[in-house]
Regions:
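Short beta-strand/loop element within the Bergerat-fold HATPase_c
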Residues: 95-107
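Short conserved segment of the HATPase_c
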Residues: 119-131
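Short helix-loop "hinge" at the ATP-lid/N-box region of the Bergerat-fold HATPase_c
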Residues: 88-89
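Glycine-rich ATP-binding loops of the HATPase_c
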Residues: 157-169
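Conserved micro-motifs of the catalytic ATP-binding
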Residues: 7, 11-26, 64-72
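Short conserved segments within the C-terminal catalytic ATPase subdomain
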Residues: 22-23, 46-61
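Short alpha-helical Gxxx[C/S/T] motif in the catalytic ATP-binding
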Residues: 145, 149
């Protein structure tokens, strides 16, 4: 899609990067609970159409007045979460569940998990490259979503880890994308 190409170019150009901030400006902070809500809302109708349930975990246990955040622009966190959620919805089976989980509050650790086929260990580095698509999937896409996510994570020094969401299920281990500051 053209919109994903443009998003990748913006991410690669460093537009709105930390170095572009005014020297005396306060560092940006992206509220994780708020951005989760916005990102889930952005993919809700597609998930509904495909029979996918989206669950959010970890926010119900937040202390009063707690607002865990990542040191980054809110729009960048939204782009990361939207891309991860779009992939999770796209690859999950009908009737499946996608889970967004705030696994740790301080420092924040955020996970997006699905029940799809997962990504074999040997392909995990390659799927972060632009235009790379795994063979053998019947899911349409451009191969740009995870490249955009990786580029933005690198810019804001977020560590992105891909692992099996359900390693005990060899047929459909799912994918868990974990975000935390490096």
């Amino acid at each position: 899609q053209v919109s994903q190409l443009l998003a990748l170019k913006r991410a690669q150009s460093g537009a709105a990067s930390p170095n572009a901030e005014a020297a005396n400006a306060a560092p940006p902070h992206a509220s994780i609970p708020q951005t989760i809500g916005e990102a889930v809302e952005s993919v809700y109708w597609e998930a509904e159409r495909l029979g996918i349930t989206i669950e959010v975990e970890g926010l119900e246990d937040l202390p009063v007045n707690a607002d865990p955040s990542f040191a980054m622009k809110p729009d960048d966190l939204f782009t990361i979460l939207r891309n991860l959620l779009e992939n999770a919805v796209r690859y999950s089976p009908k009737g499946g569940t996608v889970t967004v989980k705030l696994a740790q509050i301080e420092p924040p650790v955020l996970c997006v998990m699905d029940e799809g086929p997962g990504i074999p260990q040997e392909d995990r580095a390659r799927v972060l490259e632009p235009f790379y698509r795994r063979l053998g999937t019947n899911v349409s896409g451009t191969g740009l979503g995870l490249a955009i996510v990786k580029t933005i994570c690198d810019r804001w020094k977020l560590n992105l880890t891909l692992s099996d969401a359900r390693p005990e299920n060899q047929d459909a281990p799912g994918l868990c994308a974990t975000l935390k500051h490096s």
